[in-house]
Amino acid sequence: GEYCHLNVYNRSELVTDPGIRCDWALALAPTWDNMYKTPGVLGGSIWSGIDDIFQMPNGDAVGYGPWGPIDGWRRPKPEYWDMKKIYSPVRVTTEALSPANELVIDLENRYTYTNLDELRITWTYGEEKGTAFADLEPGEKGQLRIRLAHPEKANELYLSFADPRGFTADEYLI
């Protein structure tokens, strides 16, 4: 069934309160988390990935359906970024770091068929950079460990997870 339509039906409210677009993710996130945890649920889909125009039988284009997280010119709308994060197959559940010679980051692999060892994981911590490795089967939770030479020189960790094709699966700043 359908769920979590974008806030497009009340155009006057979008004009007077464009921030309502951010509230969309507040409904999508718990819905998706519950679907993910429920056996037998295969997932869901966005009603329209890209905004539509309507072709009439005579060839005329009429109307505009603003339902997609990507607009008619193929530009991501604000909802796109929330959707990408919520549907991400990689979850980092660590919210804060304790500076140490080894950072430990809790992960969840939400892929169905892909082990996280197939992803390229890159990290930046201050001036230190590197790649990391996580061997987590689909559906598993585990930890990513990053050794640091100078943990005292930074306080934020940037992580990037790229799939075998080079597409970014997700990014985190902790």
Model-found features: residue ranges?
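Edge beta-strands of extracellular beta-sandwich domains
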Residues: G166-I174
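Glycine-centered secondary-structure boundary/capping sites
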Residues: F54, S88-P89, G139-K141, R165-G166
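Extended substrate-binding grooves/exosites of carbohydrate-active enzymes
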Residues: G1-D106, R110-D117, G126-E128
